[in-house]
Amino acid sequence: MNAGLALLIAGWVFVLIWVPIVVLSQRKMHPKALFTLFFAELWERFSFYGMRAFLILYMTSRLFDKLSQADSDGASYGIYGAFNALLYASPLLGGMLADKLIGFRKAIITGGLFMSFGQIVLAYNAFNGDTELLFFVGLSFLAIGNGFFKPNISSFLGTFYDRNDSRKDSAFTIFYMGINIGAFLAPLTCGYLAREVHYSLGFLLAGLGMLTGVLVFYKNRAVFEGKGLPPDIPFLKSSFIAGINREWAVLIGAFLLVPVFSFLIQAEEITDYILLLVGFGILGYILFNAFKSDEKEEGQRLLVFMALFFVHMIFWALFEQAGGSINILTDRYVNKHGIETSQFQSVNALFIILLAPVFTWIWTVLGRKKLEPRTPMKFFYAMLQIALGYLIIVVGAKSILPEVNEGGLIPIVFVLGMYLFHTTGELSLSPVGLSVVTKLSPVKTVGFVMGSWFVSIAFGHKIGGYLGKLIASPPEGATKGMELQAFINVYMNWGVYIVLGVAAILFFISPTLKKWMHGVH
């Protein structure tokens, strides 16, 4: 038995023991809906992270294998960034449709089915010739489906708690743990089988995971107690155009977006312009609402949201190198001791599974003592930790520069150290970020604001794609040492210096942000 298969088996055994412990220890403190959403999101993340674990490797080794390494890497980073940008921009539309028209439940089921189909298209394509056309169609279904699913399952969870319910951060941390249980199992399973058996099997298992999530959500809908339904069912069922009601119009419109997204994933410059327009539109709309609001508190909370939006964007631009350039770095320059490259994507999720309860306990204890940091300071600590993670991998890479041309490899401990601090940074930012967005948002626009929050990740991914291209730009005939130096330069300049600069600005404006939050923690 090789190391990769041993990890796969050990991972499943660990989760089958750990999940019941988490659920049973928390079930009396929270509504039953939390645990239905926990399992639905677990399987959705299994689907996404299963594909993400090997997507960049599939592109460089199969889809663009006829290009030079530099050209293949550059094309793959660009597509990876554009796809993920659309993946996280689409929740803006999905959040609005759920708020105004179809409700959270229908949005979540529609998104899950779209993503299942997208994974199946990718599986078929990998098995039958690796054509770019079908590849982009599959990615488009995933991006559109994510738009319906991602913002609405988080917003739906928020409806089961009052604005200042002390259990809310705890609930979102448990929910976030569900995300990462799926993210832990997926690379171990889909990533391993994709590389050891066939890429099509990895995509297929990811699709079946998403179908499982939809089934869990639908079969347990009774626990939702009337929440998440369309805001106006007669209006939804009324005719929109040519005898087609509004519900069917939404579905048809989603299908019509598939060729549009397929084009945009390839047309990076056009995608850039669209993202800029969307970004300025979102921020302009939020700014307009902040200043026109009749309630001063509501307006100032929206201004806090905008500040956190920018910090969030920079964080994810660097954090999400994990599925892109860090995956390539691991594949080519790290001593993996027989572990599949894609399985390293499980390290972050494993640390979250282990550390999320610790962070929940820390925030709870500090909260009781009135010492818990406000959200802006948690974001500050997150930025410090991601910078430390990049500093660790830079030190590891520099340590082998003299012998990399002769086959020297980065010791695995540096990769694990980087993932550890990136994980603690993520735990300081992401679950509390989801929670605070629902608290800062006006009730009538929570879906839109949550969608806007995911757009900040879209911008982060787009920036991340450009960082990947900087890494993929050594001159023709570059040695391994020159290629590794490109990783070092980008990680040091962006992952350390720029991140620390953003952290310093956030530290100095935190007192003002705290004041403008008006009691929201």
Predicted regions located by residue number:
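Cytoplasmic membrane-interface "Motif A"-like loop-to-helix N-cap segments
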Residues: 100-113, 298, 365-384
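Glycine-rich segments within core transmembrane alpha-helices of 12-TM secondary carriers
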Residues: 87, 167-187, 194-195, 202, ...
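C-terminal ends and interior cores of transmembrane alpha-helices
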Residues: 110-130, 384-404
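Short amphipathic helix-loop junctions that connect adjacent transmembrane helices
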Residues: 53-77, 322-344
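Hydrophobic core of transmembrane alpha-helices in multi-pass small-molecule transporters
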Residues: 38, 42, 46, 118, ...
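Intracellular juxtamembrane helix-capping segments at the cytosolic ends
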Residues: 148-162, 427-442
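Central cavity-lining transmembrane alpha-helices of secondary-active solute carriers
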Residues: 78-99, 346-363, 459
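Intracellular loop-helix junctions on the cytosolic face of multi-pass helical membrane proteins
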Residues: 1-36, 163, 191-327, 331-337, ...
